[in-house]
Amino acid sequence: MNEIRQRLPRTREKRRGALTAFYGDSAALADELEKEETRQRIRTYSETGDDEVIGAIRLLGRIRGSVTIIHSPPGCGAIKLEDELRAGGSPWLITNIEENDSILGADDKLREAVDRAYRTWRPEIIFILATPVVAINNDDIQSAATEKEDQYGIPVVPVYAAGFRSKTAVYGYDLVFHALAKYVLKKDPDALPLPAVNLIGTAGTKTSHIIRDLDGAGISYNNLSGSLSIAALKQSLNAFASIAIDKDDSRFLLEWLEEAHGIVHLEETAPIGLAGTERWLLAAARSAGAAGSAEQVRAYIEEAKAAAVTDLEWHRLDGASVFIDLPPEQAFGVAEFVEELGGKVAALSLTHADSSHVVRLREWAGRSNPQVFIQQGQPFEKINALGKLKPDLYIGRGEAAVWAARAGIAAAAVDSVDVYGFGGVQELAPLLTKALRNPSLSRYLSAGSSSYRAGWLSKSVNWHIKQEVK
């Protein structure tokens, strides 16, 4: 992968034609993403949204034995504090760049922060996260990193997140994995092959259910999910194959392992729902190096499915129309599970979409061809779409589910739930039916005043989305 020689990886927009604004059906989006050059959409009015800095902060906080130095003013530290309060993570410092520093530079503050990080925590690795201000004052982070790496004898790794190169937050994950591949993950020629499959899941991925399934099926794995370790990342170079829980977040690592080290990555859908989990486990079991017999894998799947099916009889959706608002891989998996429960997928609201999602979009175009909205952090577009579609149930994350509830729609927030594996089936189904059968909160919230005037809500959902003109 020639990108490793470069200072930065290409953005998702350049590599895969990623879109962060779209309104249409599944077939139309698939057609657009299959074009040689995707026509980008821009918003004439944009409310909020995560950027690459936030994505990088989340992933860096999940690397065990590390300290992250956020080279920025206090604002980026506030984002990190929010992430830590929500999910915990590794230690971090902020250099507190001030007004003069943004013009004259803050190299001294950066070096002092590295010294303090090493004295305080004796970490295995130190990351220096550059932020938009550093893109302005042009601090020489590389020189500081090289100097301190020689001084302390541990990797000091720069991660360059300018905040405005890409409109997709997942590019922040690409930046972190690119930095690890460039500076840390070097293959040991004497290392023995690892008879296992790399289990890859990044920031925010809950894994207890799917790990229980892998153990029950007798599948050997190198755990690169949840809280990552440098040792496991290095071992990944010797595995026989890689499989992701969520390919959106980990795609750069998957592709780099395959292109640079010949470790094939299994293009399987997320292990959500009965069929999705079964397909995923069978793919992992078929990969070279998977321990345990085919009979053991099949026996475990049949037993776990039978237990889940019994529980699902009490949690049918009975034709309810559902609006799913999640990142792409999760959204497709949950949508399939909704159909397993007897629900109807009215619309998919995604954070982004790119050429890697074309196959799934084609599948849905052949099913119910639901509407697709790409609208991360755009409450106006979300409320407008919900008001026009009037679904029976909304499935999304907590901060966005509030908007659906205020619109009078039963809402289920799934970010606190482990949706993966057969255990995820038994955890997710009751959450959905409980929200659908107990709409009192939504009725109460909808009785209040709207955050948007009627004139705004009368506009089309894509009123502020325009095609880029070249």
Regions found by a protein language model. Give the residues of each.
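An N-terminal assembly and electron-transfer interface module characteristic of large anaerobic redox
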Residues: 1-470
